[in-house]
């Protein structure tokens, strides 16, 4: 699978992910780009799960953003509704973290839209719990930037999770 983590701190939101693509227990690619900018660079999105499924979801989510003038929550809810009700989409196996300058969300494969806890940290994928734990500890105990926290959290997840590597893509938006 993978690890995607998002941290919002001091007017900055950062989303990062590793580059490993696995097929079963085999590493197929080590430099995939699982974090992207959408909607003219105003929205960050990262995926965990099936690569082809995620690209389909990126396209659908970007269409929703266009349809709803970039309103992140409305677009996420509309995508989740479609994901839940459309037979073809229901078979897609992926999760998304999406963020703009105001909010961050997880969109799940079962059609849920999840907002972060007060700490504004989100993580998904096989290494998500490791990255989430690391990010929370770093936010609570350091003055590191959001970018530094995302990078360190991904590195910790990559050291623990066999489905996560240390080839990162990290994108950020200032507030």
UniProtKB/Swiss-Prot annotation:
It comes from the Bacteria. It catalyses: ATP-dependent cleavage of peptide bonds with broad specificity. GO terms for biological process: proteolysis involved in protein catabolic process. Na(+) binds at residues 158, 161, 164. Pfam families: Proteasome. Belongs to the peptidase T1B family. HslV subfamily. A double ring-shaped homohexamer of HslV is capped on each side by a ring-shaped HslU homohexamer. The assembly of the HslU/HslV complex is dependent on binding of ATP. This is ATP-dependent protease subunit HslV. It comes from Haemophilus influenzae (strain ATCC 51907 / DSM 11121 / KW20 / Rd). The lineage of its organism: Bacteria, Pseudomonadati, Pseudomonadota, Gammaproteobacteria, Pasteurellales.
């Amino acid at each position: 699978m993978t690890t995607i983590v998002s941290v919002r701190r001091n007017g900055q939101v950062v989303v990062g992910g590793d580059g490993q693509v696995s097929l079963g227990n085999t590493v197929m690619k080590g430099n995939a780009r699982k974090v992207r900018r959408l909607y003219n660079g105003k929205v960050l999105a990262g995926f965990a799960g099936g690569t082809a499924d995620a690209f389909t979801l990126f396209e659908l989510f970007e269409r929703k953003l266009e349809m709803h003038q970039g309103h992140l929550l409305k677009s996420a809810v509309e995508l989740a509704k479609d994901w839940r009700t459309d037979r073809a989409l229901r078979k897609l196996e992926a999760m998304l973290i999406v963020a703009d300058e105001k909010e961050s969300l997880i969109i799940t494969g079962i059609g849920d839209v999840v907002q972060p806890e007060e700490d504004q940290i989100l993580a998904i994928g096989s290494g998500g719990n490791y990255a989430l734990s690391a990010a929370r500890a770093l936010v609570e105990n350091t003055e590191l930037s959001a970018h530094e926290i995302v990078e360190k959290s991904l590195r910790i997840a990559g050291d623990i999770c066999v489905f996560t590597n240390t080839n990162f893509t990290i994108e950020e938006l200032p507030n």
